[in-house]
Every structure is written in C-alpha cells, then in structure tokens.
C-alpha cells in the first residue's frame, strides 16, 4: 500500500490494521508516497505514482522475504496507486483497488459539470496541512485546521490553498473548468494490469463509485478476472451505520475477510472459494444480491403538475403515462437549497429530506402507492425540458422513497447538472444522471423525485452570470427563475456500467 497521509495510518480508518494480515502469514508493506509523511521529494499528486510505484514493486520483488508474488490493496488515493505503472512486467499479481477512478475530472473532482465543492476543499486542505507540517509552518497548519473545525473552509478554503499550498493538485482541479476536458489528466492502466485478478470494493454513498464502475467495465471488456462488491457504504463508513442510517446486520463490513480469501487464492494458491461475479447491497431490503452492472431494471415515469409542485410537496405526480403541465420556481442565492447526504455530502448516506421538500424552491413529484414491489437497479436518469432567465443554472435532483408505514422521506440518491451560456434561456431538453443504486420498494411505498437549483455546499452555488463562481453565494449572485415544461419528461433507469455491445447499440454501430 502506498499512501499520502503518513504510512503509520495504514488506511486503518476502514481496513483492519496491517498486523491482522501479518498474523495471517503476509508481509505487509505500507509506504509514504513521494513528498508525504517521512518520504523525501516533492508531492505532485497522481502524476508521480507510475514511476514511483514501479520502483517500489521492483524493490519489493527482490526482497528476500518476498516469495515473488505481490498483491496491493487500499482505497481512494491508495486505490489508484495500484493501477499506475510504466513497466507491464512489474504489475502486481493481484489488486484490490477500492473507491477510486482513472479520470481526474469525472471520477475525482466534478459531476455534471460542477466541481465537488465541500469534498474537494476538505481533501485539498488535508493535503495542504501535511505540506505545512513537513515545513514546520505552525501558523498555516493552525489556520487550515481551524477552518475545517468551524466550517469556514467552505468560504475561505480556496484562498487558504492558494496561500499555503499553491502546488496542491486539488487546487489545480478547482481552478479548471469541469465542463471541459482541457487540462485534465486521465490515467490508463496497461492491459496486463486490467487482466490481473482484481477485487473492486465500492459504496453506494461514495463519490468515487462511478470511477470504480468504469474500471470494472474496462477490465471486463478485455477479459479481466474481476469481482465487484457494492455495499451501502460511504467513503469512510464501511459498517452497518452510515451517517444516521442503520443498514442492518448484513451491512457490517466483510472487506478484510474478502480480501484475505482473494489474496490467499491468487498469491498463495489456495483453492478458490465460490464467489459471485457482482454482489450488491439492497439499501431497502437490506440484503446482498447478485446483479449484473451491465443491465438495469425497467423504470419509466413521467412528471405531471398543474403548476403547484413547488408550492406544495404533494401536488406534483410521477405517473406511468405521459407527462403534462409546467412549473415555474425561483432560486434565491441568499438562501440556496442545502445539499444533504447522498454521495457528495460530508454527511454522506441515506437521509431524511422531508423538510427540504417542504421548501417552495424545491419541486416535488410523487408516485401513487405502488401496487407491487419495484426494484431500482442501475443509474436513474431524468430528462425534461427546462429554461432559465439567466445564462447559468444548476439542476439538482434527488430520488427518495416515502415508506408506506411512516411519514419519512428517505433520500436514496442524487445527481446534479450545471448549465452555463446563453442556451440556458432556451427551453431545451436537459438530462441529469443520478448516482447508481440498488433499492427495492415494497407495495404501498411511493417514489419521489425532487428538483432544486442548488445543493450547497456539495456543489458551489451557481452565480447565474455564465461563470462557475467562487463557491458560496456572493454579492454578484443572481436570482434565477426556472421554467420546466413536463410534456415528454421521463425518469428512466440506465445500466450503471454498460456492456460494450450495449454502448455500440446506442451509438447505432
């Protein structure tokens, strides 16, 4: 494992301590990456990791304590370090990269054309604090730490990064346009690495899920030996409780046991244990199921309203027939709609959002009580016609369940779309992709779709002037009026990791 947080932590925030693996007969090596912890050199982010990783693997394979086979594990940054290398012959014999992706723009820094705001600033400042510690800059470290403890980092974090850690890779991300691929890095493991035995561990409430699914799809495409587990977890919570929600006893993490079985098979030659190709946790029925990420369940709802779906949370409808009506609502930057839970929240996970849906700047559409069980498996997608009176707006979407036996509104997943330019003034079709999920609604439950023009601080508040803006609402932010026409609106389900043949079919090939 190679990580940028100090090797003594050893990712024990989510995994068992390396001593547990050592007691099972493994030599476990945890390294500081270049310019972090006690390692020399300058930290440059991911672009240093291919050559440094090769050097580490070569050294380890030649160590007298190594039997010649090497496995790697780790999540987030430590996940990507396993996948990068320039010499194919040095590739690990087995990999277990969790919660990471290959595309800096789409898998690490933004969604729907908008920067991850709170998440990116929080992580960037953590990296900056390590830079301050290494140069013994106590005042700068104190300022960063105080901003994180108080929440002030959401408004001054960008300035703190620029002042105290100007080469920070996350600062560079926040200075780039997430609507354009220009200037962003993408990493591509060689075919040999993708064909190695790979164990992919993901979470429904983790921001890097889409990156992990893309990695699974690429490995499958070239015949890789890949197992995929998707639990109900967030980035740092891998047990039954994620935030304030209890996912049941089956959600208690078996990650270390899974990894041990995986490495025993591929590094020590133990007999293989029967494993499902993909195991996913159903967030409502609270059990593990075998599913194919290349397929999705069937879902088709349209949106209908007589114009009061913002003023009343119970007026808008999700209907199996055609959509009808229109809704006008106003985004006031002085009181932007909060983002809550989901995969982009600092409070990640399933959350109650009934109070948010009661706001008059949130547009709600609810189904009738279901007559039969409804499984949601895949990536929800909303398509509708929408215009604004400014050259910029955000569309922030939440999908929730209204359980039959309570007054709760339990948010299941979210998505965001940022639009900039004069085309925002035209009534045009807009499409939002939400976080993938597996959740089975019971007969009598209802499904709800909620629309807003902000999700602060998960994403920066759109200033409405055609620019991305500085984060929080400021003196130049505009009031934005949004108008949606619901004819031809559609809430559908798409595969979360389409098989190559399905992708070609959609392209008409």
Residue ranges and their predicted role:
Residues 255, 268-509:
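Glycine/threonine-rich phosphate-binding loop and adjacent beta-strand/alpha-helix elements that clamp
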Residues 194, 200-202:
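Short beta-strand/loop motif that positions the catalytic acidic residue
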Residues 73, 80-143, 223-261:
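A catalytic-pocket lid/entrance helix-loop region that shapes and gates access to the active site
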Residues 207-213:
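Conserved alpha/beta-hydrolase "acid-adjacent" motif
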């Amino acid at each position: 494992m190679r990580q940028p947080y100090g090797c003594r932590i050893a990712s024990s925030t989510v995994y068992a301590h390396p001593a547990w693996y050592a007691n099972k007969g493994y030599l476990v090596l945890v390294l500081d990456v270049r310019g972090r912890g006690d390692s020399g050199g300058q930290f440059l982010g991911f672009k240093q990791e291919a050559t440094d990783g090769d050097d580490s693997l070569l050294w380890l394979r030649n160590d007298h304590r190594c039997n010649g086979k090497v496995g790697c594990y780790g999540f987030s940054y430590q996940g990507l370090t396993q996948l990068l290398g320039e010499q194919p012959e040095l590739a690990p014999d087995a990999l277990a990269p969790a919660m990471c992706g290959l595309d800096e723009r789409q898998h690490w820094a933004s969604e729907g054309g908008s920067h991850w705001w709170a998440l990116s600033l929080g992580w960037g400042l953590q990296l900056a604090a390590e830079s301050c510690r290494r140069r013994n800059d106590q005042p700068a470290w104190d300022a960063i730490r105080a901003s994180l403890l108080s929440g002030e980092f959401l408004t001054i974090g960008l300035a703190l990064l620029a002042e105290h850690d100007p080469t920070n890779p996350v600062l560079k991300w926040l200075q780039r346009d997430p609507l354009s691929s220009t200037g962003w890095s993408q990493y591509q493991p060689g075919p040999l690495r993708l064909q190695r035995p790979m164990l992919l561990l993901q979470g429904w409430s983790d921001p890097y899920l889409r990156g992990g699914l893309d990695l699974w799809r690429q490995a499958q495409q070239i015949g890789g030996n890949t197992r995929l587990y998707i639990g109900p977890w967030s980035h740092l919570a891998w047990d039954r409780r994620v935030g304030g929600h209890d996912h049941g006893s089956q959600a208690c993490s078996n990650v270390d046991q899974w990894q041990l079985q995986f490495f025993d098979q591929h590094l020590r030659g133990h007999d293989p244990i029967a494993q499902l190709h993909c195991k996913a946790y159903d967030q409502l029925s609270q059990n593990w199921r075998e599913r194919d990420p290349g397929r999705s369940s069937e879902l088709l709802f349209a949106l209908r309203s007589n114009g009061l779906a913002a003023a009343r949370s119970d007026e808008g409808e999700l209907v199996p027939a055609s959509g009808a009506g229109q809704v006008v609502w106003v985004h006031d930057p002085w009181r932007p709609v909060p983002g809550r839970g989901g995969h982009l929240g600092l409070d990640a996970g399933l959350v109650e959002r009934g109070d948010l849906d009661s706001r008059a700047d949130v547009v709600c559409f609810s189904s009738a009580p279901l007559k039969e069980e409804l499984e949601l498996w895949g990536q929800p997608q909303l398509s509708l016609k929408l215009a604004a009176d400014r050259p910029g707006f955000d569309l922030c979407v939440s999908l929730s369940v209204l359980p039959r036996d309570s007054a709760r509104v339990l948010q299941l997943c979210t998505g965001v779309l940022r639009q900039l330019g004069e085309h925002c003034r035209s009534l045009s079709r807009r499409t939002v992709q939400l976080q993938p999920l597996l959740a089975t609604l019971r007969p009598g439950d209802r499904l709800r779709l909620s629309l807003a023009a902000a999700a602060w601080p998960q994403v920066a508040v759109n200033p409405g002037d055609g620019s991305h803006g500085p984060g929080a609402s400021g003196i130049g932010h505009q009031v934005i009026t949004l108008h949606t026409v619901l004819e031809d609106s559609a809430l559908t389900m798409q595969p979360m990791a389409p098989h190559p043949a399905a992708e070609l079919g959609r392209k008409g090939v």
